[in-house]
């Protein structure tokens, strides 16, 4: 992808957040095969009975290619009763920051893709929050680290197809198909009413908005 050359440099060292899903496993393989210097970080929240299999998938890939891999296992008892996603996000970025300090890098690469952008725009519209940037930025500062997202121009299916075409093992998180959280509801319910033409119009409108 052209965004790799635009956003990533061979001489830099990157923290790569990998969940074990097709998005991050595809990005992991792309960066590894291209020769980028990467340190893999995986967070196991132990919220699903099969979450250890996600961890094993990430560890197996890293072992195969002799890549440094760090895992943060979190006791689910630390979660408060409300807003798990925000709590998980803070814990995840704290982990990235700790590993980044160990290796003297503040650059974190994540596998957000165009489907995530579309979901973000829809959620912003639902909240009437359209004054700032719509969607997801390729580069942003989050909790003390610089986050780089080189996959925003491609759809999730592209990353899934990449895994199939390159024999990259990945895991599907069944909770992504539920509707408990707002993002999951938007993905699995709201966007079912959006055809490709409507999605393209939405993306074009957001792009024009962000260029003002």
Task: Give the role of each language-model region.
Residues 181-212:
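ATP/NTP-dependent adenylation/nucleotidyl-transfer catalytic domains that generate, transfer
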Residues 1-188:
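Core alpha/beta nucleotide-donor-binding catalytic domains of modification enzymes
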């Amino acid at each position: 992808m052209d965004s790799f050359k635009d956003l990533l440099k061979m001489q830099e060292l990157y923290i790569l957040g990998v969940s074990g899903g097709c998005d991050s496993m595809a990005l992991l393989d792309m960066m590894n095969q291209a020769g980028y210097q990467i340190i893999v970080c995986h967070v196991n929240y132990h919220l699903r009975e099969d979450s250890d299999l996600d961890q094993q998938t990430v560890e197996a890939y890293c072992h195969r290619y002799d890549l440094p891999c760090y895992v943060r296992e979190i006791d689910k008892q630390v979660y408060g009763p409300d807003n798990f996603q925000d709590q998980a996000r803070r814990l995840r970025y704290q982990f990235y920051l700790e590993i980044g300090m160990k290796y003297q890098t503040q650059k974190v690469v994540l596998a957000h893709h165009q489907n995530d952008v579309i979901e973000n725009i829809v959620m912003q519209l639902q909240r009437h929050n359209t004054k700032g940037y719509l969607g997801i930025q390729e580069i942003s500062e989050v909790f003390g680290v610089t986050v780089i997202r080189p996959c925003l121009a491609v759809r999730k299916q592209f990353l899934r197809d990449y895994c199939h075409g390159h024999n990259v093992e990945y895991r599907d998180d069944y909770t992504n198909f539920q509707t408990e959280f707002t993002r999951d509801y938007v993905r699995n319910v709201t966007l079912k009413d959006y055809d490709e033409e409507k999605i393209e119009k939405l993306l074009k409108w957001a792009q024009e908005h962000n260029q003002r």
